[in-house]
Regions:
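Conserved catalytic core of the tyrosine transesterase superfamily
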Residues: 1-340
């Protein structure tokens, strides 16, 4: 069974377990989004609904929440809930907090749920729609400059600026780490997408990988000739390792297990810290480095959006607005009027 299928099965089982403690109309809602969302997304939506139900009636089991009770909720009630989840005590008496980004996501989940209830005549109105979605301050896109990319890759390839202890580990894993870094820098894939890759997802003949995006959409992403060379070397090294037939992962840990998202984050940070001190580089910064370079080379924001897997080009435009303005400013004298 592929890792992707294992993940889907895991979240499907968790969703079914949660649904046993939910009223029938929630089960119908989850069923309605089954074909349009991933198993992970369905589970996350359900967790957000469950949390809201627990707050709504703390003495009533979630499966006994009624449509009549939901119909009584006002805009002010929803505002009270959003204020509550900023800082609260969970069912295990642990203190929990949520930042603006998390609150925005939870509100989005509930808005979708209540919109469905209203559209399907379960509720007479959609009060939560009156809630203003919290605005999140836009962060400046941090990316590596061309010289920094070279320093970063040299750190991986040659072990430059590493400690003696790190060098011992580096000699065993440098081929794998170089393949990971080059693949991410030449495709812009997310760290989760990289960690989930199986060997069968790699098509060396056509220089592409097959990935599943957030939301469950499948996509084909092409990598560069440089990345291809390092991937080929890693695949040859992997083929010579004693690995159980059941292990399908492309990238493996020293224990011959699938390399986790956290492990990739740590190895990227390790090399970047030595090569580019003072600049906080994460796998997501590799993604933004790729996107910045692609936009600077092509000027095609639609290509960048499609390659990154953004469903809404507005997201891409917002992130790379400064680059777009700079490009327009640089081209202001391209059209000549009187002078030739």
């Amino acid at each position: 069974m592929s890792h992707r299928l294992q993940t889907d099965t895991h979240f499907t089982d968790k969703t079914r377990e949660l649904l046993q403690k939910m009223p029938d109309f929630v089960r119908r809602y989850i069923r309605s989004i089954h074909n349009a969302t991933s198993a992970r997304t369905q589970y996350e939506y359900l967790k957000d609904i469950q949390q809201y139900f627990r707050w709504l009636s703390q003495t009533t089991p979630t499966e006994n929440i009624t449509l009549e009770l939901l119909a009584e909720q006002t805009k002010e009630d929803f505002e009270d809930y959003l204020e509550y989840i900023e800082h609260y005590e969970d069912e295990n008496q642990k203190q929990r907090t949520n930042g603006r980004t998390s609150i925005k996501r939870k509100l989005s989940s509930l808005r979708k749920f209540f919109a469905w209830l209203f559209a399907n005549d379960y509720l007479p109105s959609d009060e939560i729609r009156k809630i203003t979605i919290p605005k999140i301050a836009k962060k400046e896109i941090i990316h590596m400059e061309e010289t920094e990319v070279k320093d970063f890759l040299n750190s991986i390839q040659k072990g430059e600026n590493l400690t003696k202890r790190q060098m011992g580990y580096h000699q065993k894993q440098s081929i794998r780490d170089m393949a990971i870094a080059c693949l991410m820098l030449s495709t812009g894939i997310r760290v989760s997408e990289c960690a989930e890759l199986d060997v069968t997802d790699v098509d060396m003949q056509h220089s592409c990988i097959h990935i599943t995006r957030k939301g469950g959409d499948e996509s084909t992403v092409y990598f560069s000739d440089e990345a291809s060379a390092y991937l080929q070397t890693w695949l040859e090294q992997r083929a010579g390792m004693k690995i159980p037939d059941s292990e399908t992962a492309l990238f493996l840990s020293s224990r011959k297990k699938r390399l986790s998202v956290r492990s990739i984050e740590i190895l990227i940070a390790k090399y970047a810290k030595r090569a580019i001190p003072g600049k906080h580089i994460t796998p997501h910064k590799l993604r933004s480095t790729f996107a910045t370079s692609l936009y600077q080379e092509t000027g095609d924001i639609y290509l960048v959006a499609e390659t990154l897997g953004h469903k809404d080009i507005t997201t891409t435009k917002e992130h790379y607005a400064k680059l777009s303005d700079s490009r327009k400013r640089d081209n202001r004298n391209k059209i000549k009027l009187l002078s030739q």
